């Protein structure tokens, strides 16, 4: 819609703009009702998300770098910070190669669901195959936090389940967001 496109264009092009409320009115709209105007009002804003990334197959760094680049090139997404890459032992299924892991901080206009779809597209572009739970992967991208939201849906859990027990998440999170509080565990 006009309001959606205008809000996105303004938020993406004006660097200091964090939130916008737009009201679009059309006087004497032909809607078949005795109204002087018809209007739509929307509010859109930038959201802060933290994304865990990892790989333990092939050229791990290349897969991660390409995933981050793809995310940075996504309309309505801005990468703000990237942790160091850490070499870590596998979690869950331990009979596999070491992982290269890290975390990034981003700002996005995407909803949590839209962001999840985009992360899955980037994983698919890296030829990720979901054969074994916690098994080897070319690229793994997970939403850790999205603002301070708590979401519990079949395919999306924010904050990410069990992140507080995973050093491969906690160490890079501490590097880029040492004072961030978990919205459930505080």
For each feature predicted by the language model, list its residue ranges.
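Residue-level signal for inorganic ion chemistry
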Residues: 6, 56, 82, 172
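N-terminal beta1-alpha1 ligand-phosphate binding loop
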Residues: 46-77, 83-87
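Short, charge-patterned binding micro-sites
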Residues: 81-107
């Amino acid at each position: 819609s006009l309001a959606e496109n205008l809000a996105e264009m303004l938020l993406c092009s004006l660097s200091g703009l964090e939130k916008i409320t737009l009201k679009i009115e059309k006087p004497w709209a032909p809607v078949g009702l005795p109204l002087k105007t018809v209007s739509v009002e929307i509010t859109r804003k930038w959201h802060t998300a933290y994304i865990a990334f990892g790989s333990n197959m092939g050229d791990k760094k290349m897969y991660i770098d390409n995933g981050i680049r793809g995310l940075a090139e996504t309309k309505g997404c801005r990468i703000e910070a990237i942790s160091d890459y850490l070499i870590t032992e596998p979690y869950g299924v331990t009979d596999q190669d070491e992982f290269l892991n890290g975390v990034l901080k981003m700002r996005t206009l995407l909803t949590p669901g839209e962001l999840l779809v985009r992360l899955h597209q980037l994983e698919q572009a890296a030829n990720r195959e979901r054969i074994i739970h916690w098994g080897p992967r070319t690229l793994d991208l997970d939403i850790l936090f999205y603002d301070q939201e708590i979401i519990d849906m079949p395919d999306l859990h924010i904050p990410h389940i069990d992140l507080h027990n995973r050093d491969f998440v906690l160490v890079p999170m501490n590097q880029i967001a040492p004072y961030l509080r978990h919205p459930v565990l505080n």
